[in-house]
C-alpha cells in the first residue's frame, strides 16, 4: 500500500504484508485511509514474495569467479524525517553506523563461500563496515552516482579508470567512538578533534598506482596582508598513470586555547603519468593560521606551526607517504579582520 502520495508529503511510505491467497478463490479487499490535506492518493500494488533470497544469492556466488556485491543506504534510510523505524535507522536518524541487518547477513553468507568479493557501497553518510574491512579484499565507495553510475563503477572495477576519490567524512568503527549526541562540544568530533583510530580517516582513498613526496619548501613571510607560499614535489612512483589529491594540513603546536590536532588548509588534484614528477604550490594567508582567543578576537598567535603534505591525513597508517616542515610565526599576536 503506497500512502502519503499527496502534495503535502514528499516521501510516500510503502506498507507491505505477506498474505496467503488460494488459487481460484475470490477475495474482498478493503482499503481505509483519511484525507487530511486534499489531493490524497492511495494505491495497492502486489508482487509474489521471493523465497530463499539468501540461498539464491549464495548459489550464484558459488557458481561465479568473482562476486560484485552492491550494498548501502538510500533516501528512506538516511533522508530527513523518513517514515521508517528499523534497527539502526529511526525516522531519518541514525542510531548505529552499520549497514542494515539483512545486508550484513548477506555479506557474511557470501564471504563464507570463499569466493572473491568486490563490495560496492552506495551511501551518502559514514558506515561502520568493520567486517568488510577484515574479510572483503576490495571496497569501492560510490556515493549516489546517478544515472551513469553503473558505467563509472564498471570503468573503475575493470581498470579502465584509475580511482582517485577521497572520503569527505570520517568512517568511525562504532557510534561508541563518538560523544553523546547532546554533548555540543567539538571534543572527539570530526578528524580535527577525534583522538581514536578511525576505520577510514577523512581524506582517505586508494589508487591503482603509488605516489611519493619530497620535502616541503616555504617562501615568503606570513603577515596580515601577505601570503606564505608552500611547495611540495610529488612523483608517480607506480606503474600506472593516475590522479593524486595532494592534501595540505596545518598543526598549531602551542596555543592559548584548544586547537585542532590538524586541519586541512588546502588540496589540489593533479594528474601524473607513471614516472612523472610535479611541484604543487599552495598559497596560505594569515586567516588559515588564525584562531579565536579567550578575548573572542581573531588572531594569529606567535609560535611554531607544522605543515604536512601527502595523499591523506598525517600520521595515519592508511597514508602511504607524507612530508612535513615547521614554520615559526614571530612577534606579537596578529589581529585578523573578521
Question: Where do the language-model regions lie?
Answer:
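C-terminal non-catalytic regions of proteins with extracellular/luminal or membrane-system context
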Residues: 1-338
Amino acid at each position: 500500500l503506497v500512502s502519503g502520495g499527496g502534495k503535502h508529503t514528499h516521501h510516500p511510505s510503502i506498507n507491505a504484508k505477506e498474505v496467503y491467497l488460494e488459487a481460484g478463490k475470490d477475495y474482498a479487499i478493503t482499503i481505509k485511509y483519511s484525507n487530511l490535506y486534499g489531493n490524497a492518493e492511495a494505491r495497492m500494488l502486489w508482487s509474489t514474495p521471493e523465497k530463499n533470497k539468501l540461498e539464491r544469492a549464495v548459489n550464484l556466488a558459488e557458481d561465479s569467479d568473482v562476486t560484485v556485491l552492491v550494498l548501502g543506504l538510500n533516501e528512506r534510510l538516511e533522508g530527513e524525517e523518513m517514515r521508517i523505524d528499523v534497527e539502526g535507522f529511526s525516522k531519518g536518524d541514525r542510531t548505529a553506523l552499520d549497514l542494515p541487518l539483512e545486508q550484513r547477513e548477506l555479506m557474511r553468507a557470501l564471504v563464507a563461500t570463499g569466493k572473491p568479493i568486490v563490495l560496492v557501497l552506495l551511501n551518502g553518510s559514514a558506515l561502520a563496515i568493520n567486517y568488510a574491512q577484515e574479510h572483503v579484499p576490495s571496497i569501492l565507495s560510490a556515493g549516489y552516482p546517478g544515472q551513469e553510475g553503473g558505467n563509472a563503477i564498471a570503468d573503475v572495477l575493470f581498470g579502465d579508470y584509475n580511482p582517485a576519490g577521497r572520503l569527505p567524512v570520517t568512517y568511525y568503527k562504532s557510534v561508541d567512538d563518538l560523544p553523546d549526541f547532546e554533548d555540543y562540544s567539538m571534543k572527539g568530533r570530526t578528524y580535527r578533534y577525534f583522538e581514536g583510530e578511525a576505520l577510514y580517516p577523512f581524506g582517505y582513498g586508494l589508487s591503482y598506482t603509488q605516489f611519493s613526496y619530497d620535502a616541503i619548501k616555504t617562501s615568503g613571510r606570513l603577515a596580515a596582508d601577505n601570503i606564505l607560499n608552500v611547495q611540495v614535489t610529488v612523483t608517480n612512483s607506480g606503474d600506472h598513470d593516475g590522479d593524486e589529491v595532494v592534501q595540505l594540513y596545518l598543526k598549531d603546536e602551542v596555543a592559548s586555547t584548544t586547537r585542532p590536532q590538524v586541519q586541512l588548509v588546502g588540496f589540489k588534484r593533479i594528474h601524473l603519468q607513471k614516472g612523472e614528477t610535479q611541484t604543487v604550490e599552495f598559497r596560505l594567508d594569515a586567516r588559515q593560521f588564525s584562531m579565536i582567543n579567550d578575548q573572542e578576537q581573531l588572531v594569529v598567535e606567535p609560535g611554531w606551526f607544522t605543515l604536512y603534505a601527502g595523499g591523506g591525513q598525517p600520521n595515519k597508517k592508511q597514508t602511504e607517504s607524507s612530508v612535513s616542515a615547521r614554520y615559526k610565526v614571530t612577534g606579537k599576536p596578529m589581529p585578523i579582520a573578521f
